[in-house]
């Protein structure tokens, strides 16, 4: 146990200088001191049953002006987080009028307010099946745009592998355009997170500290939870360094990250580690060739370094690669203006294509009606 705590300390010690520097600048006003981070009330909540019966918590947000939505946006959150991590996207996209969007955010199994699942089902394959269940239940018709952060992005890739018909164009499936018109892959990876040629990631089954925590969580889960809760400033410094970039970070954001991380049991988190080690979904990226794709990542991301996003964009070909300078892994929390402006561009592209498609269909129907009434 002392070795484990020492290992955690070693990670956090590297953050000490950064934390002290932030502390010296702490006199400046916290821009999010009064922001209700993660506490925006949804318009509706519900539960979707996964294919194995696991209950998945779902929150819906309608357009703020009460107008009719043109697109359904589904947010797929990252490892150890919850739907609450989409706070700024949920807030800002609700105000959109061009296009109006209906937002759907859900918690992965064994995360947040969703049901706990068997460790054997803690796989990206199962998460993709869960996402498919959410789409069927919450967006049975109409265009969809998927937002995937970190493990959520991996889940979207696996969905493309399991159900390519959701993404493929009329030329491929013969039944009209796929339901998924756009995808945002945020701070994620398509290949195994510890693969050669890219920076070694902490989200790796090869990391000895991760394995140590996993073994201890299985042997004495209450002890691990206690150590995590009692970590205090040590844990806060580590989270500050690993989740965010090197710039001025709102203390409220760091507190919010800690709150998110503490919402999922260590035992549940550790059960997902092997699926990261097995993650290799570059072949699935070809399915996005006829989908609008935005690949967004901070170049100070320590968990899924920017090289991963570069490779994803290169493999897709037509994807837009967005480099957010100085931002870390939680780029959508740290730099919401940069991320949201790109998401709005993506949504507007998808809406324009949908408008053109409907116009073509309407024109065709009009010509047919004229032919029959001659």
Model segments located where?
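Conserved HGGG/HGGXW glycine-rich cap/lid loop of the alpha/beta-hydrolase fold
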Residues: 54-116, 154
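Active-site loop/oxyanion-hole signature of alpha/beta-hydrolase fold enzymes
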Residues: 102-167, 171-176, 341
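Conserved alpha/beta-hydrolase catalytic His-Asp/Glu region
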Residues: 218-287
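Acidic catalytic loop of the alpha/beta-hydrolase fold
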Residues: 276, 299-304
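Short beta-strand/loop motif that positions the catalytic acidic residue
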Residues: 288-289, 295-297, 301
């Amino acid at each position: 146990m002392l070795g484990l705590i020492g290992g955690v300390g070693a990670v956090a010690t590297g953050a000490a200088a950064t934390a002290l520097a932030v502390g010296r600048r702490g006199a400046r006003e916290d821009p999010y001191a009064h922001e209700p981070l993660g506490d925006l009330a949804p318009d509706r909540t519900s539960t979707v049953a996964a294919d194995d019966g696991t209950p998945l918590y779902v929150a819906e947000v309608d357009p703020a002006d009460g107008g009719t939505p043109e697109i359904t946006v589904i947010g797929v959150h990252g490892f150890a987080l919850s739907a609450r991590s989409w706070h700024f996207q949920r807030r800002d996209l609700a105000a959109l009028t061009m296009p109006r969007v209906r937002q759907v955010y859900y918690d992965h199994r064994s995360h947040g307010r969703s049901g706990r699942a068997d460790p054997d089902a803690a796989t990206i394959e199962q998460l993709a099946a869960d996402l498919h269940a959410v789409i069927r239940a919450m967006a049975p018709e109409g265009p969809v745009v998927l937002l995937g952060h970190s493990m959520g992005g991996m889940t979207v890739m696996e969905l493309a592998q399991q159900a390519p018909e959701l993404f493929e164009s009329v030329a491929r499936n013969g039944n009209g355009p796929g339901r998924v018109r756009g995808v945002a892959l945020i701070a994620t990876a398509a290949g195994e997170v510890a693969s050669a040629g890219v920076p070694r990631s902490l989200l790796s089954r090869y990391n000895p500290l991760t394995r140590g925590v996993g073994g201890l969580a299985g042997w004495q889960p209450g002890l691990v939870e206690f150590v995590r809760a009692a970590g205090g400033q040590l844990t806060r410094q580590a989270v500050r360094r690993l989740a965010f970039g090197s710039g001025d970070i709102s203390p409220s954001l760091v507190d919010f990250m800690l709150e998110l991380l503490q919402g999922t049991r260590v035992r549940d988190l550790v059960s997902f580690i092997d699926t990261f080690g097995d993650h290799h979904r570059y072949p699935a990226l070809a399915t996005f060739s006829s989908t609008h794709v935005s690949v967004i990542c901070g170049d100070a991301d320590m968990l899924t370094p920017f090289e991963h996003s570069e490779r994803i964009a290169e493999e897709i070909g037509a994807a837009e690669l967005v480099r957010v300078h100085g931002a870390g892994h939680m780029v959508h929390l740290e730099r919401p203006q940069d991320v949201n402006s790109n998401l709005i561009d993506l949504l507007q592209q998808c809406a324009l294509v949908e408008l053109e498609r409907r116009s073509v269909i309407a024109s065709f129907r009009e010509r047919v009606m004229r032919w029959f009434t001659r």
